[in-house]
Amino acid sequence: MEPLSPYPLKCSSPKAKVFLVFFSMVLCTGILCVLQLKFLRAKGGDFYSYEVTDAKGRTVALSKYRGKASLVVNVASGCPHTEANYRSLQELHREFGPSHFTVLAFPCNQFGESEPGTNKEIEAMAKRNYGVTFPVFSKIKILGSEAEPAYRFLVDSTKKEPRWNFWKYLVDPQGQVVKYWRPDETAESIRPEVASLVRQIIMKKKEDL
């Protein structure tokens, strides 16, 4: 009797070959999916990697704000919180901006339909009534499947979805969210965090000289 071979015999049946081909295809597809996910995560890894649209319909790369601290806010013109928030936002922008800090305002009509106007009307109202000097972008959606990708990044980062107008996210110079505030929280509660980030930015610039 011949001794058994220490190596497994090659399987040459048609079914085995089909299985091997199918398994190879599944494996390759899986690897491609993983690589694609890694690429997408790298591309959208911070707030400043996105593009948005301004009130005049022009594309704006948020990368222009990289290196600054940004307070991102969903604004509305006809909300009980409108006046107090617009005034406090402009106050913060005047105090800490524009070199190291900026407010980024995104009108949204998803809360109480309190922002029904056109982009032109919204921007004009903000400048006329509250003297805003910070950017007011085009009206967006921040909830649901049609949410603006840049805003979805803020929500995903904090696991906190805005429940009303004037929800605020503080973004650091690298595009990561460091804190958020609800509409009823005053500028006084926001100021220390903004001041701290701005100090860090100034100190880093001095060190890099």
Curated annotation (Swiss-Prot):
Chain ranges passing through the membrane: 18-40
Domain of life: Eukaryota
Reaction catalyzed: 2 glutathione + H2O2 = glutathione disulfide + 2 H2O
Active site: C79
Signal peptide: none
GO terms under biological process: response to oxidative stress
Pfam family for this entry, one: GSHPx
Keyword list, A-Z: Membrane, Oxidoreductase, Peroxidase, Transmembrane, Transmembrane helix
Coiled-coil ranges (or none): none
Membrane topology: Single-pass membrane protein
Family: Belongs to the glutathione peroxidase family.
The protein's name: Probable glutathione peroxidase 8-B
The species this protein was found in: Xenopus laevis (African clawed frog)
Gene name for this UniProt entry: gpx8-b
